Regions:
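Short, amphipathic, aromatic/basic-enriched membrane-interface segments that mark the entry/exit
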Residues: 1-5, 102-111, 155-161, 251-257
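Transmembrane helix-loop junctions at the membrane interface of multipass transporters and ion channels
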Residues: 2-3, 46, 60-69, 190-207, ...
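Flexible hinge motifs at transmembrane-helix junctions and intramembrane kinks/re-entrant loops
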Residues: 2-4, 15-33, 43, 67, ...
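Structural signature of hydrophobic alpha-helical transmembrane segments
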Residues: 1-11, 72-81
């Protein structure tokens, strides 16, 4: 069976998991409290009696080294950097501008509007490692305004006019693009870390992208069309969506300096 200190460690670990699920405080606070408890009580939670009895064993230094070991993990820093880019996309309005531009150019036909949603996700995905933030925070606030332009309402027969197709594409495009890029979703990065610790094999951003490229091309090109065929919208074309997108872009004004800097940082990071 497990040793006593391992069981105590497991108890604290379980408490952290429960805290992350229930979220009485933000998740970062729960994690820091858990790390602090284990580091402070390390003689009873982290190390066995045999380790503590070794000559020259300094549990204080070992505890501190364990507590900050995550900061030396390159995967953690990659996740952090990608989240910062995602926040920048949202705060500067660059993500919204890109999506509106594609909707304006491709929104005359419902099928092309589906491709606009897919391409918007495709552009945002490499630097937004949260599919929830990308889909719900950037894409959804835009596409939810499109169906009412054609009197297509949820929970109503009019939803099949265009709304159902657009919302379905929002969900599917989010899922597809999350698998294409290593930095499109945080679990992808964690998976690389687990793979490295288990098999000592490494997989770079380029390796992931090239491995997914053949399937990615098929998914990006076929999914909007398949959804259009299998779940066809009643409305096939219209001019209201492009006009609305153009109005929104005019309200945003020209590309500001913050957006230009964000775009430059994004291109530089990807290169």
């Amino acid at each position: 069976g497990l040793e006593n200190h391992t069981w105590l460690y497991f108890a604290v670990f379980t408490g952290v998991i429960v805290g992350l699920i229930l979220e009485p405080v933000p998740g970062a606070v729960v994690a820091m409290v858990g790390i602090s408890i284990i580091a402070i009580l390390s003689p009873w939670l982290l190390f066995s009696p045999e380790q503590l009895a070794q000559p020259g064993f300094k549990f204080t230094a070992k505890s501190l080294s364990w507590a900050v070991s995550g900061f030396s993990n390159s995967v953690i820093w990659l996740i952090f950097a990608a989240f910062m880019f995602g926040t920048g996309y949202e705060k500067t309005g660059l993500g919204r501008r890109i999506a509106l531009f594609l909707v304006k150019k491709m929104g005359h036909r419902t099928l092309f509007l589906g491709y606009a949603v897919m391409f918007s996700e495709l552009i945002l995905a490499p630097v937004t490692p949260s599919n929830s933030a990308r889909g719900a925070g950037i894409i959804y606030p835009i596409i939810r305004n499109l169906p009412p332009l054609y009197q297509s309402q949820p929970n109503d027969s009019s939803s099949r006019s265009i709304g159902s197709y657009i919302m379905w594409m929002g969900i599917v495009a989010d899922c597809v693009t999350s698998a294409i890029f290593l930095t499109a979703m945080a679990p992808n990065l964690l998976l690389i870390g687990l793979m490295k610790s288990a098999s000592h094999a490494t997989l770079s951003w380029g390796d992931w992208f090239l491995g997914m490229l053949p399937l990615s091309i098929l998914l990006v090109l076929l999914v909007p069309w398949l959804a259009y065929v299998l779940y066809p919208p009643v409305l096939k074309s219209g001019d209201q969506v492009p006009r609305w997108a153009e109005t929104e872009l005019q309200a945003m004004g020209p590309l500001c300096s913050r957006e230009k800097r964000m775009l430059g940082l994004m291109v530089g990071a990807l290169v």
